[in-house]
Amino acid sequence: MSSYRPYQHIERRKSRQIHVGKVAVGGDAPISVQTMTNTLTSDAQATIEQIRRAELAGVDIVRVSCPDEASTAALEEIVREVNVPIVADIHFHYKRAIEAAKAGAACLRINPGNIGSAERVREVVNAARDYGCSIRIGVNAGSLEKHLLEKYGEPNPEALVESALEHAKILEDHDFHEFKISVKASDVFMAVAAYQQLADCCDHPLHIGITEAGSKRAGTVKSSIGLGNLLWAGVGDTMRVSLSAAPEEEVLVGWDILKSLGLRHRGVKIISCPSCARQGFNVVETVQTLEDRLQHIKTPLTLSIIGCVVNGPGEALMTDIGVTGGGNGRHMVYAAGRQDHTMPAGDMIEHIVELVEKKVSDIEAGKVEASTAKQMDPAAS
């Protein structure tokens, strides 16, 4: 079997590289996964605890809102107590950006539509330079500048891109180049078109996302369509899935999108059938239980859980460990695509967990290689 499948290749857009704290964004760096806290930032302990849950889910960068002086006052403690770079989200009050930079924020997110005059932007740029922060120019369809709304009549991709490039020029005119850009909209068509246009006319790293995407289910679908299209086209250097849900849920969905496209790998990827009358065991309950039992594993590994022999053996060919439902209460286990042994239904969960943990131990010790790594296009890592 070929170790590289050309139909899985994604040619990523070439962008310049910046840093958000210790995390590289753009260039050949992995596409980073972001989220945003929804606690009161002034409640440092609650915010720290929420960030730590996001860290366990695999977050790379976390954004916190800084609407008032109490929030920026708490930022120093938050930055000190967590293990990921913090982006300070600034709207309306440019002084909050300066305070956040002093407090140790790794990046300042500013919205050109409401941060104020060019002079205020200049002060923010100087603070970012003085304290080693990068900047995110965060353009949003819901808060475009008045002159662009008058020019275009309504928010559209062209207005989003024009706003972004205007403010990129301001930063460049101040000889500041450590910035990334986002052009978000809640409308998938508008957001995707804006990002595609922006990607074609500049080499700045892009933070991609569909803003205000909705609830956990609806927002996951909406973000998967929008971000999936962009990532498949090679557009995007860092991403956030915006959900009306806990931040760690955003992180998990973000990772699942990247894993689905082979752009990054982390933890156990379970491939499972929807189940039908042919199933030899309860696939739905088994998968739900395994997702919970295996969430502590960070090493990339694939596991197929298929209820019958129609597709089970074929799926097992492409996974590290495969399970196919059989008759008489016994099910076939595959290892590295080959039939290995059968197991009784009663011991199924514990047996699979044991097999996965043993495989992970062997991978980490360098004794074997995961099929995920074999199938992966090196250019997409």
From Swiss-Prot:
Q: What InterPro entries does its record include?
A: Dihydropteroate_synth-like_sf, IspG_bac, IspG_bac-typ, NO2/SO3_Rdtase_4Fe4S_sf
**Known Gene3D superfamilies for this protein?**
Dihydropteroate synthase-like, Sulfite Reductase Hemoprotein, domain 1
Please state the Enzyme Commission number of this protein. Answer: 1.17.7.3
The UniProt keywords, alphabetically, are:
4Fe-4S, Iron, Iron-sulfur, Isoprene biosynthesis, Metal-binding, Oxidoreductase
Metal-binding is among the record's keywords: yes
Judging by the UniProt lineage, the source's domain of life is: Bacteria
- Entry's cofactor comment: Binds 1 [4Fe-4S] cluster.
Molecular function (GO) terms for this protein are: 4 iron, 4 sulfur cluster binding; 4-hydroxy-3-methylbut-2-en-1-yl diphosphate synthase activity (ferredoxin); 4-hydroxy-3-methylbut-2-enyl-diphosphate synthase activity (flavodoxin); iron ion binding
Quote the catalytic activity from the record: (2E)-4-hydroxy-3-methylbut-2-enyl diphosphate + oxidized [flavodoxin] + H2O + 2 H(+) = 2-C-methyl-D-erythritol 2,4-cyclic diphosphate + reduced [flavodoxin]
- List positions binding [4Fe-4S] cluster: C273, C276, C308, E315
Q: In which pathway does it act?
A: Isoprenoid biosynthesis; isopentenyl diphosphate biosynthesis via DXP pathway; isopentenyl diphosphate from 1-deoxy-D-xylulose 5-phosphate: step 5/6
GO biological process terms, alphabetically, are: isopentenyl diphosphate biosynthetic process, methylerythritol 4-phosphate pathway; terpenoid biosynthetic process
Matching HAMAP family: IspG
**Which PANTHER family has this protein been placed in?**
4-HYDROXY-3-METHYLBUT-2-EN-1-YL DIPHOSPHATE SYNTHASE, 4-HYDROXY-3-METHYLBUT-2-EN-1-YL DIPHOSPHATE SYNTHASE (FERREDOXIN), CHLOROPLASTIC
Q: Which family does it belong to?
A: Belongs to the IspG family.
Functionally, this protein is described as follows: Converts 2C-methyl-D-erythritol 2,4-cyclodiphosphate (ME-2,4cPP) into 1-hydroxy-2-methyl-2-(E)-butenyl 4-diphosphate.
Could you tell me what this protein is called?
Answer: 4-hydroxy-3-methylbut-2-en-1-yl diphosphate synthase (flavodoxin)
Species annotation: Gluconobacter oxydans (strain 621H)
